[in-house]
Amino acid sequence: MFPRVSAVLPFRPLSRLPLCSAGPEASAATVVPLASPHGTVRTKCNIQRYFGTNSVIYSKKDDKSVPACEISKETENQGSTKENKKKDLVNIIKGMKVELSTVNVQTTKPPNRGQLKSLEAAIRRLQKSPEDAPQKSKSLSPELVAAATAVADSLPFDKQTTKSELLRQLRQHEEDSKAQKDGEKPKISFSNIISDMKVARSSTARASTRPVHQIQFDEGADDFVDREETADLRKRFRKNIFKGKRLNIFELKPVTEEAPETEAAPSLWDVEFAKQLAAVTEQPFQNGFEEMIQWTKEGKLWEFPINNEAGFDDDGSEFHEHIFLDKYLEGFPKQGPIRHFMELVTCGLSKNPYLSVKQKVEHIEWFRNYFNEKQDILKESGINFS
């Protein structure tokens, strides 16, 4: 804070400056401090430069002085305004403290009797739990109790209640395990009860949706009984058309089983006639796909999907019949050049995948007939065929 300018300071009027009786048009007054020498004067500009901090106190005007009485009054007003501001600030702070204290007082009002009772009960439970903990913790192992106490000591809040809660949870686990071990029934949970419940169907809702002229049946609560009744009704009304009494409306003709007609293979003339008929109705190919289809029918292209046995008409013989052909060499000599020749023939036929079993047998029979016709020549050469 700056020092106040005294209003009782002696002033010396100069010839160049007006007195205090000057009007409002006068400029800033000269103020002569006690320690200043005679003849030195501080104008308003000097005061504003060294002492003034607020522009509201003085109004600056060019090269004019203000009376000293006005300066003293304004400085007193400035000091009073600052003191008032301080007082106001202190009052505001005091008011804030009072409001906070009133809020605290309001929050700490005595609760209702019901709340007091609940608090007393909670306090009793908390007081009882640490007392009961050592008695109930006897069933627990000392290692678990020591671990629970270590955990409770490591936490910053209430350690005794934490320890009691941990021990209670451990005891609950032990009780459940004992109950399962002894074969006791598990506790019935609310979810299991809801899952086993059945929804009862009311007949009023359905009856309202039906027309009046329809017959209404009472629906029982048990669906199983309804299912049995409907099953019995179905059995009663189920009839067989062959068990009823005949009405003799239609004439009964004896059913004779006719022998299936054997389909004869088409003759060569029929096949040729079919080819000529197809050639008459055949039109030129419109695209490459039709040409490929025709070539597939003629055997020029493979059939799709690709089959290695396409066009191979077998008589349904097994695989071993194609390979083991030694049984067809009966009647041939068991040794000699003819036997050796026929073994080579059968070996080659067993490796031929293009001939059927019938064709292979016919091939062997042809050699049999050939050697039978040449028996005279074989006897002359000293070879026994039989």
From Swiss-Prot:
GO terms assigned for molecular function: protein domain specific binding; structural constituent of ribosome
Keyword Ribosomal protein: yes
Places the protein is found: Mitochondrion
Major place of residence: mitochondrion
Top-rank lineage group of the source organism: Eukaryota
Cellular component GO terms, alphabetical: mitochondrial inner membrane; mitochondrial small ribosomal subunit; nucleolus
Keywords: Mitochondrion, Ribonucleoprotein, Ribosomal protein, Transit peptide
Magnesium listed as a keyword: no
Record-stated family: Belongs to the mitochondrion-specific ribosomal protein mS31 family.
UniProt subunit comment: Component of the mitochondrial ribosome small subunit (28S) which comprises a 12S rRNA and about 30 distinct proteins.
The protein's name in its UniProt record: Small ribosomal subunit protein mS31
Species in which this protein is naturally found: Bos taurus
